[in-house]
């Protein structure tokens, strides 16, 4: 049997009275592309033609002059020569046969003629219609379903004729060439021409030449055509013309794919929501590129809706690997557009890869202007899916009825949208004096094989005399059937009603139905005539006629409407304006019988293995094994790609690849592995191709594309942090490690990889490291100093410093060490002092004191003493003491002392005391003493002091001192002392003292004293001391001394209570207690302040 394919084709032959034939509007029904054209035809009265035929004189009547003026004004703007190339490719899903058709119409030598009719043809394929276009399969792979424009489209051509000067028109046409390559391409270049022509007086028919015959309008100049019935504007509502029913012609399905001349029907019904399965995964769809372009000239921003200009939406997107079979995504077209211009049902393109595998199928929701795609198990088999979608859509004339409407159109895939601003432009009526009309095909029903034509008669509201309308199905390249089954309805437009510029009526009930059988008569030549008579209102004619798609010579649907009005009732002069509306189908069959064989496709594979011996050749080691789950990606020539993973045997495979094309295969390196050597040995079936390779199909499968990997070795880094006691920067045998030191490992960019601390032996280690560059950082331990770095010649024994840059190349590195030693001095002293000193001191002392004293005392004393003493003291003491005193005393004493003492003592004391005292003393002492002291003091001191003091003192001192001291002090002090000493001592003493004191003392004293004294002393002392003192003291002194005494007594010690110096001794004891009380009082006050 012979399976016919409906393919795009334009029939080419010399045609009389035709010029500027071109495709205007296209849509796709199944594999049928439909383009609608409109041809305007203007006729002239016989008298004008005859005058021109018989004479060359330029004679015109006044009416004709007016006519030419109007006509030539239009012609200057609209007359053009047009060349159209229509390239259309159709895909048949059922058998995967791709048919390509290219059409080129060239129009030359257009001259003036008597009746110039320009036709537009539209070619229709009846294969599956899709939005998603594919480029011709000339070894170019796209993950793209280019949209086959699943809409009927329409445009118009118009020309106006006046009969004044003879002319002829020559049209040269090139036959279109039909091919049956594997192509899924569908696009059309359509436009409209509007011309005004003068009538020819002669014409002839030649090959590639069209001339207007002189007889065309001979019998239509002096009288109206026979069979017309005159009617006036007053037309009452009548029943449907011809009283014939018609099947519903709206919302019908159209063929999607076919292998015979009588196609089967697949359809998508609009207003039916997609049955969603799985989850909506719009959030997992990544749009990488999208754009909106105009069908003709994208730079002008104008959509010529009556010229079949469409909007093209291109989007490229990636599908996340998380998407599963049954999940859905959405694509939204603009709310002011429709996928099809003439049909109410259409197919939604499947999203396929370049090998033909279906990624997703779609359904359309007309209410929401949304396509819902459901993913197949393709997404479960492949990864890194990239797709390209190309959709075409047309202006929805129900949404945009008016000319020059500005729109901001928006298209959206998943969550990403794109916008474009356009202006919608509609054609204007064709007029020739009072003859004016506008016509378009507005619907095609491919199931019932009917077309609907909407005609505006007198839309410009002229006063048109003797108006006649002829509707003819006699197209030169195809015809409709005008017979008893044709439905014609006539509607009158009221004075306050407007006709939509879109030439599309959606609700005829708004207009007055004036259909009348009496004024419409069927002709004898597949036509019908309607006589309107004299009118000045617009009318709408709706014509529903049939076509026969099974006729052997059937190629187009063509229907012509002509309006004729009388200009001069006396001469019979008239004017005509015509439209030819055309939908062109072309059929083609495969070579011979049956379907065209599918194009042969090929495979690429095959193996990924673990190359244990790293030689780049398979099977050279018994331990080598396949690697599973390795990601392998195939990239098509257009940049789209898909990925699979190797199975448990290390195998992978890509199918459906085209011969002669070059593909890229990429292997992802598994974690923990390194690519082995590539192109080793002489056998390409056993070597490794590395990470990526380009493969060209040369008429056979290529199952030699393999890749090998070996496990990447891991390395360690360390090693040691030690206590460098000799500070030489080199590890010594007796030097120990330092534990707890923080060590940080970073990459070469400073990003932290890991941290650790040294163990009890000072060791640390980082493992599982690849070859590369690293940074090791040591945190310096508190109280220690970085030792010398890079000392000596042994890198494993020296210190490398705080931060070390390390390069690991196929080996461990245990030479990264560092050393530290203790700080020499760390002194932190905080002292705030304000002193004013004026002193005059001459001191020479040599003190030798040997005392060993251990005192442990805990005393809490609260005393209230009243002492009245008069003492006279004469003492000679020799003291040898060794004392070690650690005292914390708190004294609370309240003493009132009045003493007068006279003491004469000679004491020899050798004491060994161990004292630990804790005393709390609060004393209030009132002392009245009278002492007379004569002392001579020489002081020479050599002191070694280690003190920890924090002193905050405010002292006012008047001293003059001359001191000779040798002091070696190592102090680390942090001390904060606040001493508040308030001492009020009123001393009135009269003492006579003669003392000779020889003291040899070696004392270690740690004291904290707070002393406030106001004393008036006159002394001269001679003292020799050598003391080693560690003291923390706060002192606030106000002293005034001016005395010089030197006494020596040797009197015998008196009996207790019987000595004549008793008064003096009492005074001395009272003074001693008073001083002690003052000291303890100051200490207590200081302690209280510290506690506060």
From Swiss-Prot:
The molecular function terms in GO held by this entry are: metal ion binding
TM ranges: none
Looking up SUPFAM superfamilies in the UniProt record yields: Bacterial adhesins (SSF49401), Hypothetical protein PA1324 (SSF117074)
Q: For the region Interaction with human fibrinogen, what residue ranges are annotated?
A: 579-590
User: Compositional bias (Polar residues) spans?
Assistant: 120-140, 160-170
| A Gene Ontology BP annotation from the UniProt entry | cell adhesion
Q: Does the keyword Secreted apply?
A: yes
| Region Ligand binding A region, residue ranges | 52-599
Query: In what residue span(s) does the CNA-B domain sit?
Result: 600-713, 714-824
Per the UniProt entry, the propeptide covers: 1057-1092
A Gene Ontology cellular-component term: extracellular region
Q: List the ranges annotated as motif LPXTG sorting signal.
A: 1053-1057
**Record field: compositional bias (Low complexity):** 84-98
Signal sequence coordinates: 1-51
Bias category Acidic residues: which stretches?
A: 64-76, 791-801, 820-1039
Family label: Belongs to the serine-aspartate repeat-containing protein (SDr) family.
- Any further remark recorded for this protein: The addition of calcium stimulates the interaction between fbe and fibrinogen, but this effect could be due to calcium binding to fibrinogen rather than to fbe.
What is the role of the protein in this entry?
Promotes bacterial attachment to both soluble and immobilized forms of fibrinogen in a dose-dependent manner. This binding occurs through the beta-chain of human fibrinogen. Could contribute to the initiation of foreign-body infection by allowing bacteria to adhere to biomaterial surfaces that have become coated with host proteins after implantation. Is important in the pathogenesis of central venous catheter (CVC)-associated infection model.
Q: What is this protein called?
A: Fibrinogen-binding protein
| Name of the gene encoding the protein in the UniProt record | fbe
């Amino acid at each position: 049997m012979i399976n016919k394919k409906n393919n795009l084709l334009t029939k080419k032959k010399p045609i009389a009275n035709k010029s500027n034939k071109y495709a205007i509007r296209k849509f796709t029904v199944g594999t049928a592309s439909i383009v609608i054209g409109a041809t305007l035809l203007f006729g002239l009265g016989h008298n004008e033609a005859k005058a021109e035929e018989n004479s060359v004189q330029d004679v015109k009547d006044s009416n004709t002059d007016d006519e030419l003026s109007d006509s030539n004004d239009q012609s200057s703007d609209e007359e053009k020569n047009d060349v159209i190339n229509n390239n259309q490719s159709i895909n048949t899903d059922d058998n995967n046969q791709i048919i390509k058709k290219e059409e080129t119409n060239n129009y030359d030598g257009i001259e003036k003629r008597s009746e110039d009719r320009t036709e537009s043809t539209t070619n229709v394929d009846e294969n599956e219609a899709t939005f998603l276009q594919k480029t011709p399969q000339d070894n170019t792979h796209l993950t793209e379903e280019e949209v086959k424009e699943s809409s009927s489209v329409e445009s118009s051509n118009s020309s106006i004729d006046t009969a004044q000067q003879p002319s002829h028109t020559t049209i040269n046409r090139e036959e279109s060439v039909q091919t049956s390559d594997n192509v899924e391409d569908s696009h059309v270049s359509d436009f409209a021409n509007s011309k005004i022509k003068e009538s020819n007086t002669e014409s002839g028919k030649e090959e590639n030449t069209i001339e207007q015959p002189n007889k065309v309008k001979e019998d239509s100049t002096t009288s109206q055509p026979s069979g017309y019935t005159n009617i006036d504007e007053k037309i009452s509502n009548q029943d449907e013309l011809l009283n014939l029913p018609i099947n519903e012609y709206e919302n019908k399905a159209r063929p999607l794919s076919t292998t015979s001349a009588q196609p089967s029907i697949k359809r998508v019904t609009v207003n039916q929501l997609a049955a969603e399965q799985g989850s909506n995964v719009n959030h997992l769809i990544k749009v990488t590129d999208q754009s909106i372009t105009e069908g003709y000239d994208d730079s002008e921003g104008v959509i010529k809706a009556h010229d079949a200009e469409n909007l093209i939406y291109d989007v490229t997107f990636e599908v996340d690997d998380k998407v599963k079979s049954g999940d859905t995504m959405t694509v939204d077209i603009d709310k002011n557009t429709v996928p099809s211009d003439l049909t109410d049902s259409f197919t939604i393109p499947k999203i396929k890869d370049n090998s033909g595998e279906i990624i997703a199928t779609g359904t359309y929701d007309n209410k929401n202007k949304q396509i819902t795609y459901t993913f197949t198990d393709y997404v479960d088999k492949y990864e890194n899916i990239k797709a390209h979608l190309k959709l075409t859509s047309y202006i929805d004339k129900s949404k945009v009825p008016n000319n020059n409407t500005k729109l901001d159109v928006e298209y959206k895939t998943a969550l990403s949208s794109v916008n474009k601003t356009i202006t919608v432009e509609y054609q204007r009526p064709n007029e020739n004096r009072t003859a004016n009309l506008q016509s378009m095909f507005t619907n095609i029903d491919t199931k019932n094989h009917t077309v609907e034509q909407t005609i505006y008669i007198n839309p410009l509201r002229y006063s048109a005399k003797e108006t006649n309308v002829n509707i003819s199905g006699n197209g030169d390249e195809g015809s409709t059937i005008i017979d008893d089954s044709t439905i014609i309805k006539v509607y009158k437009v009221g004075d306050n009603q407007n006709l939509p510029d879109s030439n599309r009526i959606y609700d005829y009930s708004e207009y007055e139905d004036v259909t009348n059988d009496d004024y419409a008569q069927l002709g004898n030549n597949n036509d019908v005539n309607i006589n309107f008579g004299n009118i000045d209102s617009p009318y709408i004619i709706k014509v529903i006629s049939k076509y026969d798609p099974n006729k052997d010579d059937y190629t187009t649907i063509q229907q012509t409407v002509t309006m004729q009005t009388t200009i001069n009732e006396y001469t019979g002069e008239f004017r005509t304006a015509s439209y030819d509306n055309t939908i062109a189908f072309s059929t083609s069959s495969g070579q011979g019988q049956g379907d065209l064989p599918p194009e042969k496709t090929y495979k690429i594979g095959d193996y990924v293995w673990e190359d244990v011996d790293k030689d780049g050749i398979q099977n050279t080691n018994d331990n080598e094994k396949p690697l599973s789950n390795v990601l392998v990606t195939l990239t098509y020539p257009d940049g789209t790609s898909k990925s699979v993973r190797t199975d448990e045997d290390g195998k992978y495979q890509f199918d459906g690849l085209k011969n002669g094309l070059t593909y890229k295969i990429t292997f992802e390196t598994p974690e923990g592995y390194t690519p082995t050597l590539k192109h080793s040995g002489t056998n390409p079936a056993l070597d490794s191709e590395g990470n990526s390779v380009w493969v060209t199909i040369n008429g056979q499968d290529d199952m030699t594309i393999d890749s090998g990997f070996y496990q990447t070795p891991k390395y360690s880094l360390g090693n040691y942090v030690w206590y460098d006691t000799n500070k030489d920067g080199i590890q010594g045998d007796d030097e120990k490690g330092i534990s707890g030191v923080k060590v940080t490992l970073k990459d070469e960019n400073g990003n932290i990889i890991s941290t650790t601390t040294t163990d009890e032996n000072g060791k640390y280690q980082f493992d599982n490291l690849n070859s590369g560059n690293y940074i090791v950082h040591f945190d310096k331990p508190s109280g220690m100093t970085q030792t010398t770095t890079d000392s000596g010649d042994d890198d494993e024994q020296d210190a490398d410093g705080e931060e070390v840059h390390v390069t690991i190349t196929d080996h461990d590195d245990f030479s990264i060490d560092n050393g530290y030693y203790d700080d020499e001095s760390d002194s932190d002293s905080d002292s705030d002092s304000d002193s004013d000193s004026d002193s005059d001191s001459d001191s020479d002392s040599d003190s030798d004191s040997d005392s060993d004293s251990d005192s442990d005392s805990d005393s809490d004393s609260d005393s209230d003493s009243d002492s009245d003493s008069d003492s006279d003291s004469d003492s000679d003491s020799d003291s040898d003491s060794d004392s070690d005193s650690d005292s914390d005393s708190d004294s609370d004493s309240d003493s009132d002392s009045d003493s007068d003492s006279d003491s004469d003592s000679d004491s020899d004391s050798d004491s060994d005391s161990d004292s630990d005292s804790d005393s709390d003393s609060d004393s209030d002492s009132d002392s009245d003493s009278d002492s007379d002291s004569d002392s001579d003091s020489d002081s020479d001191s050599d002191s070694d002091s280690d003190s920890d003091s924090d002193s905050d003192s405010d002292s006012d001192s008047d001293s003059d001192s001359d001191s000779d001291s040798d002091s070696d002090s190592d102090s680390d002090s942090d001390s904060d002392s606040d001493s508040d000493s308030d001492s009020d001592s009123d001393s009135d003493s009269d003492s006579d003292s003669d003392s000779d004191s020889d003291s040899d003392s070696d004392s270690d004293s740690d004291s904290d004293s707070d002393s406030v004294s106001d004393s008036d002393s006159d002394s001269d002392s001679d003292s020799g001391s050598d003391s080693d003192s560690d003291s923390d003291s706060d002192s606030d002194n106000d002293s005034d001394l001016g005395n010089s005494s030197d006494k020596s007594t040797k009197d015998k010690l008196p009996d207790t209570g019987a000595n004549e110096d008793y008064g003096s001794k009492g005074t001395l004891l009272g003074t001693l207690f008073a001083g002690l009380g003052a000291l303890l009082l100051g200490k207590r006050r200081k302690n209280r302040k510290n506690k506060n």
